[in-house]
């Protein structure tokens, strides 16, 4: 949607041109009118560049930057076309019952009621659920508010989007739990569904601590993290080098996110090196000393 917001900036820049020529036609001082137009258009260019950078989410968005975003978003522009035509039935149902009379003044960035998508009761997790899930479920299913999405302090995911991603663990456990595994595979749901748990009990979806997780589930967590960090085929991030991935995982061990004993085994066994040789790109495989990460 950044292109829609860019178009609004274009409208304001065009309005500045119109105001300039109107002022000239009415006998105003051309030099001062030109300076006012050029200053406003330069300001709009700078403000859009800032909004676009917020959309990328490449750095921490401080409270000062969030305040600037709200200030920019408060600029007004005039809409002359009906914003209710051409919508699907569901989208139209989220709109207010009465359309705003045209022309309508809009803010440059908005969090509108129709941006808030309610979460169905069926998608909430009762505290006494039979699987033992302990996850904080956001009130909304989605919040598509423009300021809400641009004001994320770290990254680009809203609380609603992050929950949707994390929810894959819930679905994994629910689905696998319904399958009639033979005796020797009965631990599969726990192994597959526990790789986002942390040793200090702050992970998800059950907030299990180290002693509540099987060794295989703790191994799966290490394998999953290492693969995710080094994967070079993800559209949203480049793959880390071997040394970068191990440095991050060493920090995760210190923070009690992964099992320290199994991480040491992962390093001393050379599994990280074997995996790198088979699955990582040559430019990612740099020299490492395992002693630096123990």
What are these regions (language model features)?
Residues 1-294:
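Histidine- and acidic-residue-rich, metal-dependent catalytic cores
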């Amino acid at each position: 949607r950044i292109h829609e917001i860019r178009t609004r900036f274009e409208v304001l820049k065009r309005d500045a041109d119109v105001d300039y020529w109107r002022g000239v036609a009415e006998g105003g001082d051309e030099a001062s009118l030109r300076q006012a137009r050029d200053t406003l258009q330069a300001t709009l260019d700078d403000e859009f560049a800032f909004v676009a950078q917020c959309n990328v989410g490449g750095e921490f968005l401080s409270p000062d930057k969030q305040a600037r975003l709200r200030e920019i978003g408060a600029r007004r522009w005039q809409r002359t076309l009906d914003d209710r035509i051409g919508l699907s039935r569901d989208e139209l149902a989220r709109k207010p019952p009465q359309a705003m009379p045209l022309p309508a003044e809009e803010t440059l960035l908005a969090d509108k009621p129709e941006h808030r998508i309610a979460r169905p009761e069926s998608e909430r997790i009762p505290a006494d659920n039979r699987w033992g899930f302990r996850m904080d479920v956001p009130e909304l299913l989605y919040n598509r508010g423009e300021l809400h999405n641009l004001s994320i302090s770290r990254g680009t995911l809203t609380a609603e989007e992050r929950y949707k991603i994390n929810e894959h663990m819930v679905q994994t456990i629910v689905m696998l739990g319904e399958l009639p595994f033979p005796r020797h595979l009965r631990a599969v749901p726990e192994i597959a569904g526990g790789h986002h748990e942390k040793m200090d009990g702050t992970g998800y979806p059950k907030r299990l601590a180290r002693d509540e997780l099987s060794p295989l589930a703790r191994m799966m967590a290490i394998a999953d993290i290492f693969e995710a960090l080094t994967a070079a085929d993800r559209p949203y991030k480049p793959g880390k080098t071997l040394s970068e991935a191990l440095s991050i995982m060493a920090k995760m061990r210190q923070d009690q996110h992964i099992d320290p004993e199994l991480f040491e085994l992962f390093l001393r066994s050379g599994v990280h090196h074997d995996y790198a040789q088979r699955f990582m790109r040559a430019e990612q495989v740099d020299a490492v000393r395992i002693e630096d990460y123990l």
